[in-house]
Amino acid sequence: MIDSDGFRANVGIIICNRYGQVMWARRFGQHSWQFPQGGVDDGESAEEAMYRELYEEVGLRPEHVTVLTSTRSWLRYRLPKRLVRQDSKPVCIGQKQKWFLLQLKSQDSAINLSSSGHPEFDDWRWVSYWYPVRQVVSFKRDVYRKVMKEFAVTALSFQTQEIPKKRVRQKTTG
């Protein structure tokens, strides 16, 4: 669904764990990382699109997550000119996104990047809450900053446990 201004309707998904970290996924066969996202189909609500994309991209079902909140408005970003497909009609110049903040209720093992026949991601990890703002591709950075700022109080209030410290092995001599 591309609107009259050339923006494609899209949903973005931020999944947080009980440590206040967020899921960060690497695009299949690329070096770029991002949050799961995807288009809203004709006749589909933003929430319906979010659940469909959640399963297609990371293999999670509604019972695996709790929806904590969503953005108050649609956030937009423009694609760089090199990524705009001028031969497609209508021309899509960017995305308008409704974002959802989810809390993972299940174990990490429920995440399955190959749940659909065409994986979007080939790796994922938990990262600190603000990490994605600095790491996402530059043309998405402003939207990421806005959504992370809007969700911060909610996301960080659901941190129920401290991140386990990695055990460091002591070298023994002798």
Curated annotation (Swiss-Prot):
GO biological process, one term: mRNA catabolic process
Entries under SUPFAM superfamilies matching the protein: Nudix (SSF55811)
One Gene Ontology cellular component annotation held by this UniProt entry: cytoplasm
Broadest EC class assigned to this enzyme: hydrolase
Motif (Nudix box): 38-59
Keywords: Hydrolase
Residue ranges of domain Nudix hydrolase in the record: 6-149
Stretches assigned to coiled coil: none
A molecular function GO annotation: mRNA 5'-diphosphatase activity
UniProt xrefs under Pfam families: NUDIX
InterPro entries found in the cross-reference section: Nudix_hydrolase (IPR020476), NUDIX_hydrolase-like_dom_sf (IPR015797), NUDIX_hydrolase_CS (IPR020084), NUDIX_hydrolase_dom (IPR000086), RppH (IPR022927)
EC number, as in UniProt: 3.6.1.-
Reported cofactor(s): a divalent metal cation
UniProt family annotation: Belongs to the Nudix hydrolase family. RppH subfamily.
Function (record text): Accelerates the degradation of transcripts by removing pyrophosphate from the 5'-end of triphosphorylated RNA, leading to a more labile monophosphorylated state that can stimulate subsequent ribonuclease cleavage.
Name this protein carries in UniProt: RNA pyrophosphohydrolase
Annotated organism of origin: Shewanella oneidensis (strain ATCC 700550 / JCM 31522 / CIP 106686 / LMG 19005 / NCIMB 14063 / MR-1)
